[in-house]
C-alpha cells in the first residue's frame, strides 16, 4: 500500500483499550495538529444498532479463527482523500493499520444478509472537525454502580465540550435526525465511500 499516511505507525497513536471513542477523538486531534489540510477529509464512524449488539470480525478482542466479537458499539477513523483511496484506521482490528475501505468493510462487517435483523449494523459518520467540537464524555459509562472502573481510563482528563458534560449516547444512537453527522445502513455506508471499478468504468463512458 503506497499512500502518504496520516499516522505512519500505530505506535504513534494514543490508545486505551475499551475507550475507542476517545482513541478516535485523539486521532482527529492529531490530524488537526499535524496535517490540518487533511481534516476536512477525515471522519469518526460509530457503528451500533438499536439493541447495541453488533458483530464485528477481525477484532483483537475477538474469539476463534475469525476473531469475532459482539460490541455494544465501536468507533473507527476514516480518511477519504480521493475516490477509492479511502483508508480505515481502526486501533482494535487485527487487519493492517491502515486498511483500504473495501477490504476493511468486507472482512470486518461481512454482510447483513446472514445476520438476524437485531444484529444489523448501522453507521453514524461524523466529520472530524465536528467530532472534535461536539464530542463530550465524562466516562460514566465505564463505571460500576459502586464507582469503580470497568476498565482503567486514559491518563489524560476526560474530553469535555463547552456545551455538554456527557453526550456519548447521542453518537451511539442510530436514529436518523438525532445526533451529529449522518446515519447509514451497511449498504448505504459502502455506497458513500466506495465505488467498484466496474461502476467507475460505466460512469466514465
From Swiss-Prot:
Any one GO MF annotation of this record: protein-N-terminal glutamine amidohydrolase activity
Binding partners and assembly: Monomer.
This protein's encoding gene: tun
Keywords: Hydrolase
Protein name: Protein N-terminal glutamine amidohydrolase
Hydrolase listed as a keyword: yes
Pfam family, one: Nt_Gln_amidase
Observed effect of gene inactivation: Defects in long term memory after olfactory learning.
